[in-house]
Regions:
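Catalytic-core regions of core metabolic enzymes
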Residues: 1-691
């Protein structure tokens, strides 16, 4: 049977070159009415004389001073790409006309289909079926168009300044906003595609095409619906492998979007966390705002990367040092004390009141000698205990039009040139927070790709995106198992045991006589559970540590009276001395497939909310890393005299359970809570499935 990744592994990249460098173009719906898309796009298309541009209008002989054709089929020799800007009621016939004329690619601006209602979605599906039957391809509908600057293809509402970034956006208006941001950050576009409803050509296809585009050095994405999440991961990993950074701004992924769930796992799993897990796996930078998207792009395009999180902060004032350090640590960086040898060296380069531990505070020496910045940075860049450097504060001000101190402009520019030369010759990133980002000194640094920001939080974000992103281990392909209908707790516990994971000794009972027989089968203390309940503890359906048969019978009578379950499970009470309860859950995400959650478990799972996510299945090493990334990881390693738990057994159990959950996509939620991990092993104490 096919595994969850089989669709990804069998994906055949589509040749979309004709969209980005067509031999000829037609704009259907071209008009002189400046308020209509047909006018706006036709006017943009005519900016280039590289290829024939045909205007199609069934009612007018001339548009924009050029002769028109009544139908696409009337165009002699046909066209490669047609942009359709027609009313939705005319779209179906227009597409049939285009396909009959031999068009290879359709860019459908028209809205009012799949994004509106089920009837529109059905029409959209029928259109795509006809497009495929004709061997053509379609971008959209409900899109803003396409631009390829290198090939002079201008089929969108606006001009996009040339550059090296491919922008793939599901929102037209956000793309227009990003134009302003790109200009502010001195970046430009290799190409732009408004992906619209992704009825045919998808985000995955366009990522793959952009990876192969020699003019594209980075890919920026705004997406509201990933569709095939695993396909997205595969395509983004291709970009990572050829060193083209991918930055994603994803909408509709807040914690408030978490679905109503029957299990703890579902309640703890938000859309945002799933997307974060997918982006980690793909080596993708995930951002929250258009501004951060620009910061991440700028950082990703510069060639220097930090291989660690140790930052040296250089300032000429204590306030900037304190704020910078706090923000860095909030982003997962450390600002460690420099080695004694580095402190001695820096002390020899500065004056007595300077602080050289880290942060390095020049304490006013910068206005005595701006070259002191270069002296410090040059030394720190070769320090093996430093991964990256942040200058924060006044640097850049001495060469500005309104300097604090006069006559230091040439020295500051000289210092900037020295730093630029030093930075260019090595691999560690330098980032600058400055009150004067437009000064000549900062221009020297910007010329070699050193990011400079007016806001300290932007500078710290830039450093964060300069850290080397690493690819996670791609989940193995798993064989899907035959669905198990109506699976119960009594079925699941033996199934887990058959996979090599310990479970308590158990008997299923229905009446008092069977309870008495069970007490003769094994000794207590006992656990009694009412079967068929999702949250047994909440309704008194679990009784723990029952010492003997008499206590067991009392609890059985109570549960049968109060709950009335069809069956009950009697289990041997497992010794939990020095144990830690873990939750292991697998949910089925409609875009990304099986998602694994690991966290601190038991009855306080949703209170503690200490959990991490990964796409399933995972191997034992990845499971171990997940456990160690929990805030409560010290509990696993031994705490206040307690022995460490058997982490290897826990990791192996999690890996096995992740494969089991991934192999049963009909299990919408599959949860083991708790998995008791002790110094001598791991035991599944409870399990549930929601279909």
């Amino acid at each position: 049977m096919e595994g969850p990744l089989s669709k990804v592994l069998q994906h055949i990249p589509r040749d979309l070159k004709f969209f980005f460098d067509p031999s000829s173009i037609a704009v259907v719906g071209a008009t002189d009415d400046a308020s209509k898309w047909g006018h706006i796009i036709a006017k943009q298309a005519l900016r280039s004389a590289k290829r024939p541009i045909y205007l199609v209008n069934s009612r007018r002989k001339e548009v924009l001073g050029r002769p028109t054709f009544a139908r696409l089929i009337d165009v002699p020799g046909g066209v490669d790409v047609a942009v359709l800007a027609v009313p939705v009621k005319a779209l179906s016939d227009t597409i049939d006309d285009a396909l009959a004329s031999g068009v290879k690619g359709l860019i459908v601006i028209t809205a009012g289909l799949g994004e509106v209602d089920d009837a529109g979605a059905q029409v959209q599906r029928e259109i795509v079926t006809r497009v495929h039957a004709a061997g053509a391809a379609l971008i959209g509908p409900n899109c803003l168009g396409l631009v390829d600057n290198a090939n002079e293809v201008f089929l969108a509402s606006n001009a996009f300044e040339p550059g090296s970034v491919a922008l793939l956006s599901q929102s037209g208006n956000l793309a227009l906003e990003l134009q302003g941001w790109f200009s502010a950050f001195k970046l430009g576009f290799s190409r732009f595609v408004s992906i619209g409803n992704q009825a045919d050509i998808t985000l995955i296809d366009l990522i793959e095409s952009s990876v192969d585009d020699p003019m594209t050095e980075a890919i920026a994405i705004y997406v509201e619906d990933f569709h095939d999440g695993r396909g997205f991961i595969q395509a983004a990993r291709r970009a990572y492998e050829v060193r083209k950074p991918v930055v994603v701004l994803a909408a509709g992924s807040s914690a408030s979007a978490a679905r109503s769930a029957q299990s703890h796992t579902g309640a703890l799993t938000s859309d945002r966390q799933v997307i974060e897990a997918a982006c980690r796996l793909a080596g993708v930078a995930l951002v929250n705002t258009p501004r951060e998207l620009m910061i991440a792009l700028q950082a990703g395009l510069q060639p220097r990367r930090a291989n660690g999180s140790r930052v040296a902060v250089v300032t000429d004032g204590g306030g900037h040092a304190t704020v910078a350090s706090d923000l860095l640590e909030a982003r997962g960086f450390t600002v460690p004390a420099l080695s004694p040898s580095s402190q001695t060296e820096l002390r020899s380069r500065l004056w007595a009141q300077s602080t050289v531990v880290n942060p390095v505070d020049l304490a006013g020496y910068g206005e005595q000698d701006p070259n002191s910045y270069a002296d410090v940075v040059t030394w720190l860049l070769q320090d093996p205990d430093v991964d990256s450097i942040l200058i924060s504060g006044y640097f850049g001000g001495y060469s500005s039009p309104t300097p604090f101190a006069q006559g230091l402009d040439k020295q500051e520019i000289s210092a900037a040139r020295t730093m630029a030369e030093t930075v260019r010759a090595q691999s560690k990133p330098l980032c600058v927070h400055t009150m004067y980002p437009d000064s000549p000194a900062i221009a020297e640094l910007s010329a070699v790709g050193v990011p400079a920001h007016y806001a300290i939080e932007d500078a710290v974000a830039s450093l964060a995106h300069s850290r080397n992103l690493t690819l996670g281990a791609l989940p193995d392909e798993v064989e899907l198992q035959l669905p198990i209908d109506g699976i119960t707790y009594c079925d699941l516990m033996p199934l887990i045991l058959s996979k090599g994971i310990a479970t308590p000794e158990m008997r299923v009972v229905h009446n008092r006589e069977e309870v008495m027989h069970a007490t003769n089968a094994f000794t207590g203390p006992f656990v009694l559970k009412a079967n068929g309940l999702l949250h047994k503890t909440d309704v008194g359906g679990v009784a723990l540590n029952l010492p003997d048969g008499e206590a067991l019978l009392r609890e059985f009578d109570r549960m049968r009276s109060e709950i009335g379950a069809a069956s009950y499970s009697i289990e041997r009470m497992v010794d939990s001395t020095n144990g830690v309860e873990i939750i292991v859950g697998i949910t089925q995400d409609q875009r990304f497939g099986a998602v694994l959650l690991v966290g601190l478990g038991g009855v306080l799972t949703e209170v503690l909310k200490d959990s991490v996510l990964a796409l399933a299945p995972v191997d034992a090493e990845s499971a171990r890393e997940m456990l160690l990334s929990l805030k409560g990881a010290p509990l696993l390693m031994g705490h206040r005299g307690r022995p460490p738990v058997d982490l290897e057994s826990a990791a192996k159990a999690i890996a096995v359970l992740s494969r089991l959950g991934a192999a049963h996509p009909e299990w919408q939620e599959f949860e083991i809570n708790p998995l008791l991990v002790t110094p001598i092993g791991a035991t599944a104490l409870d399990v549930r499935v929601a279909l």
